[in-house]
Amino acid sequence: MSQDWSQFKNFSIEEFRCQHSGDDGMDLNFVAKVQKLRTAFGAGLTISSGYRSPEHPIEAKKATGPGSHASGRACDIRIYGQDALDLLHLALDSGDFTGIGVQQAGDRSRRFIHLDDLDNQSRPTIWSY
């Protein structure tokens, strides 16, 4: 089923496709929240991981089964330093995200902030990798 991505000024379907299968399984309501965050941030955001099919190697090896990326309601944004701190504050203040993961150690090219909007019992939550 084809989805209409024309509502997103700063993002395209290609940025969010599964890097393993090429599938598009993003929830457009979630992408709208990321677009709202991007607009508030006022600068480009690089999506390092969006949708992951259940067969994606990262999802397939999870003991509890596929996670938030497989639901189409999560993404990782490659960002570090002051920009990461600014984005983190905006994401927290927005109230749109119930899961926020922060990876800011090591090589800058591998640093990111994870965002999701799952609505299970253990939310809201924030964690570090």
Predicted regions and their residues:
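Generic alpha-helical scaffold signal
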Residues: 24-31, 50, 71, 81
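Extracytoplasmic cell-surface/polysaccharide-interacting catalytic and binding patches
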Residues: 1-40, 108, 114, 118-129
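Extended, low-complexity, intrinsically disordered C-terminal regulatory tails
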Residues: 32-62
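Solvent-exposed, flexible loop/coil residues
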Residues: 9-12, 55, 60, 64, ...
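Catalytic cores and adjacent binding grooves of peptidoglycan-active enzymes
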Residues: 65-66, 70-75, 79-129
